[in-house]
Amino acid sequence: MTGQLVQYGRHRQRRSYARISEVLELPNLIEIQTSSYQWFLDEGLREMFQDISPIEDFTGNLSLEFIDYSLGEPKYSVDECKERDVTYAAPLRVKVRLINKETGEVKEQDVFMGDFPLMTETGTFVINGAERVIVSQLVRSPSVYYSGKVDKNGKRGFTATVIPNRGAWLEYETDAKDVVYVRIDRTRKLPVTVLLRALGFGSDQEITELLGDNEYLSNTLEKDNTDSTEKALLEIYERLRPGEPPTVENAKSLLVSRFFDPKRYDLANVGRYKINKKLHIKNRLFNQRLAETLVDPETGEILAAEGTILDRRTLDRILPYLEKNIGFKTAKPMGGVVEGDVELQSIKIYAPESEGERVINVIGNANITRDVKHITPGDILASISYFFNLLYKVGDTDDIDHLGNRRLRSVGELLQNQFRIGLSRMERVVRERMSIQDTNAITPQALINIRPVIAAIKEFFGSSQLSQFMDQTNPLAELTHKRRLSALGPGGLTRERAGFEVRDVHYSHYGRMCPIETPEGPNIGLINSLSSFAKVNEFGFIETPYRRVDPETGLVTGHVDYLTADEEDNYVVAQANMKLSEEGEFLDEDIVARFRGENIVTNKERIDYMDVSPKQVVSAATACIPFLENDDSNRALMGANMQRQAVPLMNPESPIVGTGMEYVSAKDSGAAVICKHPGIVERVEAREVWVRRYVEVDGQTVKGDLDRYKMQKFIRSNQGTCYNQRPIVSVGNEVVKGEILADGPSMELGELALGRNVLVGFMTWDGYNYEDAIIMSERLVKDDVYTSIHIEEYESEARDTKLGPEEITRDIPNVGEDALRNLDERGIIRVGAEVKDGDLLVGKVTPKGVTELTAEERLLHAIFGEKAREVRDTSLRVPHGGGGIILDVKVFNREDGDELPPGVNQLVRAYIVQKRKISEGDKMAGRHGNKGVISRILPEEDMPYLPDGTPIDIMLNPLGVPSRMNIGQVLELHLGMAARYLGIHIATPVFDGAREEDVWGTIEEAGMANDAKTILYDGRTGEPFDNRVSVGVMYMIKLAHMVDDKLHARSTGPYSLVTQQPLGGKAQFGGQRFGEMEVWALEAYGAAYTLQEILTVKSDDVIGRVKTYEAIVKGENVPEPGVPESFKVLIKELQSLGMDVKMMSSDDTEIEMRDTEDDDDHQSADKLNVEVETTKE
């Protein structure tokens, strides 16, 4: 027997074929959401209040400071919020201090700043009763980016951009004449020396001394028309503010506000970190030849003589001195934008590949501290120096798609940005109020208007592209949605603009973003999924774990380092499947490793790190595909995406052939009930589990408090599937923290269970499985194998109208007693009633416009009291295809104190549950992207059967395998059969699972035939089929594309208002479009009358269709069609262009065209009781 037994949770053992022992547990899979939100509550909010404090009025007399904040308790629990359609939120209170500097008076107050939405334990938000997820956004990190370009003559040049988090951009570029230009905030370009002069380096000599003499600089100086700081400032002002009279002072203040004012220009922590890293002098000195001798200024010791080549070792030796004091100098700009000296670090080197000894200056920005969030003159000088260095092949260009240059904005940061917008709007209001109100009577509460803050947060949660309605089809869909990374959204890319490069798989994605899981279609590559072991660091860069190799001994240690993409570029990383000894020594001399995206074979001394696990490359959903390594990536992509569409079944099964990820995914998804404290189970009911805690007291374990865990029973999920939790522990079980107490939907014994293990044969059967169609045995219908439960919610509200309030009642005009039999005395359907399409759910009447009564009606009214009530029937009825059993009814009344929207007096919700058995037209799939539609459900007795008489469950077309190259399904089939014979479950982790020989070994162990195929007998004749057939157990899932949701038929229904043609689509109860090609078909056939009927009375001949209906009802001949409405519309459009269009008959008389409004078709329709609806498109 190969493989070893592994325990997953309390109830499941699997035989695992993994060869690599995992040194690192999988992290909590929704940590990306929870930790980011926690950071926001702990630090993000505080940062915001510190940034905005103090708000001073225009005189500087009053100052408002935000001291501290606290979050209160939420008003309702999460479940109550879902029921009441309210937001799960807690009140935010801020301590505000108002100081009057004239009188020295200080007032402190706690100000309520609105209800702030809270994250649930499972990483979601409940907004207006619906669960939503905030998706993390992948954006370009603020930094300096250099890139090469080739112009049309083939000349090589460069461009560079300084991108802040918010604020103006600085761009540098070269032109064909080797002049270096700068653009300030996307304006017209200026020679770069103009910007240097504006910073205070006024003369040509100063600039040349600073940057070193080179032809690019002299070309630029020639092009530069300014010769002093003042002129440069005026030149820049004219470019930025054309048409305004320039003065030096205005120019200075403009540049200060554009670049050096922390309120207007923000690099954020990450921008400062990236700029310091990029512009540090050490990166450009590597492997260069010194043109000056480096001396330690403190001791006078020579560290490196002129002409020394700075290799890695020399550079490491002088690095501490570089950090401290070598090459530091202070430039003293005169009259520039920013007063004060500029700290720089400058070292001279010889230009590589230059004839003669050309010396170039390498200038660094002398490591500016992290709290300087705006750009400094030092940064600008260093970035310009880097640009000139690049022209001499010193330094590197940047790859914008590298994950070292793209970062994640998770929930916390997205919320913080939104909160910042709200606070800055509030700041304006506060300033205005400070100047208007009486300074003595003023209070913090009176100054602060919290509306803009609340509005900004509401807008973000309600309508931002990144705040999405949670995909709750099954636990895996839920988990994946929380780990999704989107490059779209505000401040990101748009679908149309994104090219191939952005969407492509990049080598830096390894271990950070899944190369498989991404949608098919226009969003491919723009929406990704976080890899299984990845984490996000403080700057928002994605890190992946690696095992450290001890440089002294060369042994692989258990120590794990998390590396970002740009850190990883400095190391050689070995694969996780390298053979190791017990001590951690590499057993092979030559090792396959990765370095900067290249796969190399190297000796073991060069290895710095090793992968922690083979599945660190892929996401949680992809890691659930067994034999992923044998599938083509396109099909694996479909497999990963389709698992998310699996409908929760009534009695699910976890896969016989799994990957070991099923337990972790289910546990972290938020669908299961997790034990919070260790203890012992005291009581188990369908609705709750009681656990008595264990508490440590003086080294003794004693029983403590009782925890009660409530189950969700038959709740409607966001997608209309059934969300139900079932306990899986028994009384007396000792449970530990983090153990699963109850299964959620699509779970069995604590493991993810999206489908069922069924007996599958690869064979054709009378052509019924042509083109991926699936033939299925009736047993799967009878035994409820693929039966799922669906819950739909319908609501009806009684509003106040201009003519009086609507009323929910049993007394509905023109409705017989038979239709009311399931309504209670209030006119609301009873729970448990079985309803069909068109049945009443809630009886409701709306007042009609009151007409003037005739004398007879007034007399009758006087005699009998109430007149025939002028009300319309606006009851809620079951829509087409919505029939089922009433699961629950909820009634909300304004009088009972329920919060309802304005104008609504009563709200009734009815939940209808449907049990959907599998049927022809339903879509099914395996986990390898092998999808198909059920074409035929055969009686059990007609299905082919095994020699022991067992009929198979499903027949798949063998032609679906070779061209698709998803061989994983065949391996799964055979291994599944062997496992069923052996009565075991199997784990075959991705990239480290069962090899071919393991599968053969297990087949042999199970006593199966040595080709793993079987003789099958035809169920109809009892004859054996000619060839042996591959039969085995495959895991098949039923997808959310069900035929019941798609089937649609219409006789009459709503019509469009303008063209009077039937609407389209099932949602509008529309018709089928008879298009251009269908018309050609009937023309070719010569079916003139059928065609005329389709184009007129069945479509938009308004009078004709009513008369036709009338004729059919009365049993008369169908009359001649009239003029279609769309023809009238055409004539009206031509008339609107000023053409006089008339319609003439064959005898030259004008045909009158009546407008629809004057027609009497509505009256005749009323007599016939035909509904003629018109709908605005």
Swiss-Prot record:
Listed Acidic residues bias regions: 1147-1161
Region Disordered: start-end pairs: 1147-1177
GO BP annotations listed: DNA-templated transcription
Keywords: DNA-directed RNA polymerase, Nucleotidyltransferase, Transcription, Transferase
Residue ranges with Basic and acidic residues bias: 1162-1177
Reactions the enzyme catalyzes: RNA(n) + a ribonucleoside 5'-triphosphate = RNA(n+1) + diphosphate
One Gene Ontology cellular component: DNA-directed RNA polymerase complex
One Pfam assignment: RNA_pol_Rpb2_6
GO molecular function, one term: ribonucleoside binding
Transmembrane region(s): none
Stored CDD domains: RNA_pol_B_RPB2 (cd00653)
EC number(s) stated in the UniProt entry for this protein: 2.7.7.6
InterPro entries: DNA-dir_RNA_pol_bsu_ext_1_sf, DNA-dir_RNA_pol_bsu_external_1, DNA-dir_RNA_pol_su2, DNA-dir_RNAP_su2_dom, DNA-dir_RNAP_su2_hyb_sf, RNA_pol_bsu_bac, RNA_pol_bsu_CS, RNA_pol_bsu_protrusion
Oligomeric and partner information: The RNAP catalytic core consists of 2 alpha, 1 beta, 1 beta' and 1 omega subunit. When a sigma factor is associated with the core the holoenzyme is formed, which can initiate transcription.
Role according to the record: DNA-dependent RNA polymerase catalyzes the transcription of DNA into RNA using the four ribonucleoside triphosphates as substrates.
Protein family per UniProt: Belongs to the RNA polymerase beta chain family.
Name used for this protein in its record: DNA-directed RNA polymerase subunit beta
Organism: Bacillus anthracis
Lineage of origin: Bacteria, Bacillati, Bacillota, Bacilli, Bacillales
